[in-house]
């Protein structure tokens, strides 16, 4: 299964492509590619430009996140805290205890306290 994650931020459009060969849940997805694109105040133009450079039919899932701009597109979306929590589950290394995650964006600085 191949997935595309899009973050529509205050100053950039970021994307990550991930793949998971075994969908039974025993294998973690692996990052295939990622990119960041400054949108200079025009996230729609930047998003369309980046999407036009991809073969969207090659993705089984596409989802977007972002505080404000994700609400203006017709894609499945999740909140930033939910996406951060989900992603952290895949990148956390065993034996590492992390009390919080910092999300430092173009306009918003957030600290997510983990329990």
Segments predicted by a language model, with ranges:
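Gly/Thr-rich phosphate-binding beta-strand-loop-beta motif of the actin/hexokinase/Hsp70
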Residues: 1-27, 98-115
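Short amphipathic alpha-helices and their capping/turn segments at secondary-structure boundaries
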Residues: 3, 52-54, 92
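Short secondary-structure boundary/capping segments within folded domains
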Residues: 5-7, 54-55, 61
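Electropositive phosphate-/nucleotide-binding environments in soluble metabolic enzymes
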Residues: 9-12, 40-45, 78, 82
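N-terminal cofactor/phosphate-binding cores enriched in small/glycine residues
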Residues: 15, 30, 50-51, 61-67, ...
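N-terminal phosphate-binding loop and adjacent alpha-helix
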Residues: 26-58, 69
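Local beta-strand N-terminus motif with an aromatic residue
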Residues: 58-60, 97-98
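Conserved phosphate-binding catalytic cores of ATP/NTP-utilizing and phosphoryl-transfer enzymes
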Residues: 68-115
């Amino acid at each position: 299964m191949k997935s595309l994650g899009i973050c529509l931020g205050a100053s950039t459009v970021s994307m990550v492509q991930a793949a998971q060969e075994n969908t039974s849940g025993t294998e973690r997805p692996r990052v295939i590619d990622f990119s960041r694109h400054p949108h200079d105040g025009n996230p729609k133009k930047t998003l369309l430009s980046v999407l036009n450079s991809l073969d969207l039919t090659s993705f089984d899932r596409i989802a977007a996140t972002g505080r404000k701009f994700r609400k203006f597109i017709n894609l499945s979306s999740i909140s930033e805290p939910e996406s951060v929590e989900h992603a952290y589950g895949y990148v956390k290394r065993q034996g590492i205890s992390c009390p919080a995650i910092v999300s430092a964006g173009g306009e918003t600085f957030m600290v997510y306290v983990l329990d």
